[in-house]
């Protein structure tokens, strides 16, 4: 049964709603499903005193909901759709000069605003189901709010939803009035039937459905993630369906007539089994449904920064969505919901879904911002800002597509692209194809571009077996034309035909305001060419390049392996016919394990595109170290992003910066040992590293290999500006270069704390050998240590961090005879044994009985 307006809970707050809108500019209304906010409240708005007869725009997130609500409201008024209440959708509208309430989809409002920033004649904009937070809704709200704040202080805004996160919204609408309505729903019993293996959820769903279709007496609504799942279950269930039950698919890409059939009341005493995506979560009421079966899954388009495009991802729905789905069983009577997952799984899920602005492709939205005159999301009153890095990446993509200038103003191409109801990439492809068709006299190039754009908007028309070894999109065009009568193909061709007419109309005369996106393309234009033999299939790559300039890809050494202009490696099966081509355009990519795989591509005649001026290369001087010549050589490269398309050796003088960069790259590749550090340089580094490890309080700069390699430009770079040969590099005084990193005071401390030599009593300079494994070592003959009673030490004497040297005591023949770090203990202890041996071996030398008080000497006894 259908509830009349008088029976609906929203009626209880009618006076409050009317007063709030008459007295304030902004209202937030929270009303659960079944309250009547979409089917009753809009009719009250027509009589608002504050509107003075002005128009109302009522936004709906889905086309089928917009059309149904317009029809329902018109019926309540006893009028035809298009009189007082009308609707406007993409490609379809029913409005007249008498229409005061237009039910529209969110993207339509954006286009209306772009053509009329003051919303002339409109007094109120109503955003229904705002909790869904689609990208289009966020954008439409931001533009409307911008108009309200800057141009139309009389413009009213009403946000309605079953559940509104009012905290974030109130930040942008601090003056808004908040109202809440009771809902009307019936109890829904919830049970959980999780599959034993989550990967086999479709088979489990099929088993559950088989068990209920013949026993359940009412209509059943099944929530599935995507259209592929709907088709699979529909095919598997066809043989099990009782005659009393109709099987109806319901998803966004379905023709409106078929969507209408799915939600219309069943006739002749029959029930329905509706297999739906999340399109049926809100807005739509399917009469007779008292059983919901929820897969707990959804397919969402997530923007992948690796592929620079959306990827369809299946994921678990949030709790809020699961609650909404279950509620569909209790809209008109008590019901039951079977969740195909466990209760524990439900409890672990997030409360709300992530808003689309944080995960979707931002290019279409930022293109609209550019049209609006904004160069940053922060310039508009957005409910939520996208992540900054993603936003900046998207702006740069639009600049690279030459749709925006570097100052984020619309270019000439950008203005043309804004007239097309498709992604900016595809629109750029269409306008470029039309221009090339005329300039290069290539027949039917625009037709081919329109077919490619329409194909890329849809799922692949090849089955999985065909796709395995054939990613050539040109073959899809041929199949599309040869099998044009297939239902799926027909939808693609209709869209391609629409693109074609819009493009033709754009060249003949300016498209009227609001024509793009929501007025049908002129039918007087010539029809698209669908003859595969006449289409320039070999030019697919030429067309696709305008949509994906960063995906020009050059073959690497291995067949099927390519490098793209934006620096990512991509692969296709080696058996694919395209795998041997030198250059391709990788139109669609997907992540497979650790690599990016090509789903759709086309061969690309790069050098023809360069000759025609379609692709512009940049000249880049490239230096590299030649191992055979042992020197740096230079080459002139013609590059497209990361791709080198042509290189020639050159002897021209190169900039010092490039020389330094090349040397640093080579040294990092080879390691620090590749530099010819002499003994002095090596000892310097050992002293420095020893000082850092034992005298950390001095806060000296680092001198480890990793640090020196990372900072080559600072300590070595200034001395490489005219070095071209390795022999020149080897001649550099690395000790001096390293010491130059210390200031004068640090150098003096370095000499004092970590001296290079120990000067003994006989004035001999003995090298101190530093090590990170032990204390520093010094070697000298025993005779030159007589009289030394304090072991020499290095380190900071002011900080109690001195370290005694390891003394390697030598015989007159300069052979080690003892090692000690305590001379006093040596003189008093093991010296006696050493003295005996030395007297026997070297009788001419002086071996005193009291070495601690003897005079150090270099002489033998007869010269003393």
Language model features with spans:
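P-loop NTPase motor module signature
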Residues: 1-429, 509-513, 517-526, 584, ...
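Residues that form generic nucleotide/phosphate-binding pockets
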Residues: 20, 172, 208, 265, ...
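Second RecA-like catalytic domain
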Residues: 244, 249, 293, 301, ...
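Solvent-exposed loop and beta-edge segments used for protein-protein assembly and interaction
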Residues: 23, 214-216, 579, 680, ...
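Charge-dense polyanion-binding interfaces
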Residues: 126-127, 255, 259, 432-460, ...
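Flexible, glycine/threonine-enriched loop-and-boundary segments that flank and lead into catalytic domains
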Residues: 263-264, 531-581, 733-787
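A positional "C-terminalness" feature that preferentially activates on distal terminal regions of long
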Residues: 629-864
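A short, structural micro-pattern
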Residues: 182, 331-332, 360-361, 446, ...
């Amino acid at each position: 049964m259908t509830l009349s307006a008088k029976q609906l809970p929203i009626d209880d707050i009618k006076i409050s709603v009317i007063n709030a809108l008459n007295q304030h500019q902004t209202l937030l209304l929270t009303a659960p499903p079944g309250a009547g906010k979409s089917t009753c409240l809009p009719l009250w708005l027509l009589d608002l005193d504050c509107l003075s007869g002005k128009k109302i725009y009522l936004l709906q997130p889905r086309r089928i909901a917009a059309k149904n609500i317009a029809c329902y409201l018109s019926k309540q008024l006893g009028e035809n759709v298009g009189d007082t209440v009308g609707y406007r959708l993409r490609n379809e509208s029913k409005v007249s000069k008498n229409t005061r309430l237009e039910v529209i989809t969110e993207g339509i409002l954006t286009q209306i605003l772009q053509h009329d920033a003051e919303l002339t004649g409109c007094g109120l904009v109503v955003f229904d189901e705002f909790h869904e937070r689609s990208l289009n809704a966020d954008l439409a709200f931001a533009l409307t709010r911008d108009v309200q704040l800057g141009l139309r202080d009389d413009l009213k805004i009403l946000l309605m939803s079953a559940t509104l996160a009012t905290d974030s919204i109130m930040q942008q609408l601090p003056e808004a009035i908040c109202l809440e309505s009771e809902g009307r729903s019936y109890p829904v019993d919830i049970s959980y039937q999780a599959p034993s293996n989550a990967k086999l959820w479709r088979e489990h769903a099929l088993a559950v459905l088989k068990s209920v279709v013949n026993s359940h007496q009412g209509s059943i609504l099944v929530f599935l993630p995507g259209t592929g799942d709907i088709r699979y279950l529909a095919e598997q269930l066809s043989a099990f369906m009782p005659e009393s039950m109709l099987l109806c698919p319901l998803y966004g890409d379905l023709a409106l007539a078929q969507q209408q059939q799915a939600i219309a009341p069943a006739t002749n005493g029959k029930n329905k089994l509706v297999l739906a995506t999340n399109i049926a979560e809100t807005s739509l009421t399917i009469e007779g449904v008292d059983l919901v079966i929820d897969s707990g899954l959804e397919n969402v388009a997530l923007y992948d920064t690796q592929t620079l495009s959306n990827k369809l991802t299946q994921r678990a729905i949030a709790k809020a969505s699961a609650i909404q789905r279950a509620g569909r069983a209790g809209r008109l009577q008590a019901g039951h919901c079977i969740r195909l997952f466990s209760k524990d799984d439900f409890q672990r899920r997030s409360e709300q879904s992530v808003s689309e602005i944080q995960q979707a492709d931002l290019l279409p939205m930022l293109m609209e911002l550019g049209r609006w005159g904004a160069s940053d999301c922060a310039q508009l009153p957005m409910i939520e800002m996208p992540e900054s890095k993603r936003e900046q990446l998207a702006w740069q993509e639009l600049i690279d597509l030459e749709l925006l200038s570097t100052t984020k103003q619309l270019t000439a191409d950008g203005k043309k692209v804004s007239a097309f109801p498709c992604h900016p990439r595809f629109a750029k492809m269409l306008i470029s194809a039309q221009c090339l068709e005329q300039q290069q006299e290539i027949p039917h190039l625009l037709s081919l571009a329109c077919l490619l754009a329409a194909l890329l908007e849809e799922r692949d028309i090849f089955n999985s077996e065909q796709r395995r070894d054939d990613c050539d999109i040109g073959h899809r065009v041929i199949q599309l034309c040869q099998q044009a009568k297939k239902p799926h193909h027909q939808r693609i061709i209709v869209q391609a035909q629409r693109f074609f007419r819009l493009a033709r109309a754009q060249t003949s005369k300016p498209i009227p305001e609001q024509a793009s996106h929501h007025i049908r393309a002129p039918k007087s234009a010539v029809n698209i060419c669908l003859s595969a033999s006449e289409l320039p299939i070999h030019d697919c790559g030429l067309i696709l390049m305008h949509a994906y300039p960063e995906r020009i890809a050059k073959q690497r050494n291995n067949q099927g392996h390519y490098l793209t202009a934006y620096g990512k490696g991509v692969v296709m099966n080696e058996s694919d016919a395209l795998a041997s081509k030198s250059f391709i355009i990788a139109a669609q990519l997907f992540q497979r394990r650790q690599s990016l795989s090509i789903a759709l591509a086309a061969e690309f005649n790069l050098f023809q595109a360069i000759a025609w001026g379609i692709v512009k290369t940049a000249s880049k001087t490239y230096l590299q170290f030649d191992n055979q010549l042992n020197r740096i050589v230079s080459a002139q490269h013609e590059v497209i992003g990361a791709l080198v398309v042509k290189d020639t050796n050159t002897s021209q003088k190169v900039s010092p910066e490039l020389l330094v960069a090349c040397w640093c790259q080579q040294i990092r590749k080879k390691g620090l040992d590749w530099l010819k550090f002499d003994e002095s340089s090596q000892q310097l580094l050992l002293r420095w590293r020893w000082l850092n490890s034992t005298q950390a309080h001095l806060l000296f700069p680092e001198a480890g290999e990793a640090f020196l390699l990372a900072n080559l430009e600072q300590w070595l770079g200034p001395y490489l500006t005219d070095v071209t040969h390795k022999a020149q590099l080897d001649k550099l005084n690395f000790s001096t270069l390293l010491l130059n990193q210390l200031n004068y005071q640090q150098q003096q401390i370095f000499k004092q704390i970590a001296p290079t030599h120990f000067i003994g009593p006989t004035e001999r300079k003995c090298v101190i050998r530093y090590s990170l494994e032990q204390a520093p070592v010094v070697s000298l003959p025993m005779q030159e240590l007589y009289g030394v009673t304090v072991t020499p030490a290095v380190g900071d004497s002011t900080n109690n961090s001195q370290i005694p040297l390891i003394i390697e005591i030598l015989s007159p023949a300069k052979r080690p005879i003892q090692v000690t770090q305590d001379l006093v203990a040596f003189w008093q202890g093991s010296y006696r044994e050493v003295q005996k041996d030395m007297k026997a071996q070297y009788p001419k030398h002086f071996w005193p009985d009291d070495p601690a008080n003897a005079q150090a000497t270099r002489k033998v006894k007869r010269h003393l």
